[in-house]
Amino acid sequence: MAYLRSSFVFFLLAFVTYTYAATIEVRNNCPYTVWAASTPIGGGRRLDRGQTWVINAPRGTKMARIWGRTNCNFDGAGRGSCQTGDCGGVLQCTGWGKPPNTLAEYALDQFSNLDFWDISLVDGFNIPMTFAPTNPSGGKCHAIHCTANINGECPGSLRVPGGCNNPCTTFGGQQYCCTQGPCGPTDLSRFFKQRCPDAYSYPQDDPTSTFTCPSGSTNYRVVFCPNGVTSPNFPLEMPASDEEAK
């Protein structure tokens, strides 16, 4: 009987190990509430200051993104709106957020047995962020940051309530969005790159903005407002509603 129990426990551990490639811990250190969003897994979660949310990411997860929504107000059914990062007026996101929103992007257990991950400002900026492996191993497997006061310094042409849009969102076209083939940085994309050199500043900013870790070697952590206190130019929360993420 003991053998059967131990075999069953081993099976469960092996199943969990096989199923989940990594856990992603999302933490809010901002002095205001952030409504975290995660697709294609996770959905959404309200995070008051100091709260965390752990997402179990399966092997093969790709095109995944995590972002923070600000100035949200949801009813008990999880319907409402957010000033930045809104995903169709629902708490539990199934699609991408409306710019501007700082993105943590990742794909797990991809070619060459690597996890690929980055911070992207291609959808603009709303909240400072770090994205880090919990077990860094050197090379391109280390913490990355975007913690500059981009909202406070945002060019007037890109400034919107609660954030700073990327020029691709604002102006569109090949020059800013690389819609018809290769393109390079512009003066406006350099504004983002100079302040957050780890992050994507335009769609083809790959060489300095993509990071990798050996698959299965580490979990990951995303922190909103890693320095704890943000500039007054960052948004303050709206009055809390009665909703709570399930």
UniProtKB/Swiss-Prot annotation:
Q: List the disulfide bonds.
A: C30-C225, C72-C82, C87-C93, C141-C213, C146-C196, C154-C164, C168-C177, C178-C183
Known Gene3D superfamilies for this protein? Thaumatin (2.60.110.10)
Expression is induced as follows: By abscisic acid (ABA), salt, salicylic acid, wounding, and fungal infection.
Q: List the SUPFAM superfamilies hit by this protein, alphabetically.
A: Osmotin, thaumatin-like protein
Q: Which SMART domains match?
A: THN
- Signal peptide range in chain numbering: 1-21
Q: Which domain of life is it from?
A: Eukaryota
Q: List keywords of the entry alphabetically.
A: Disulfide bond, Signal, Stress response
Q: What InterPro entries does this protein map onto?
A: Osmotin/thaumatin-like_sf, Thaumatin, Thaumatin_CS
Q: Which PROSITE patterns does the annotation name?
A: THAUMATIN_1 (PS00316), THAUMATIN_2 (PS51367)
Q: Which family does it belong to?
A: Belongs to the thaumatin family.
Q: List the protein's name.
A: Osmotin-like protein OSML13
- List the lineage, top down: Eukaryota, Viridiplantae, Streptophyta, Embryophyta, Tracheophyta
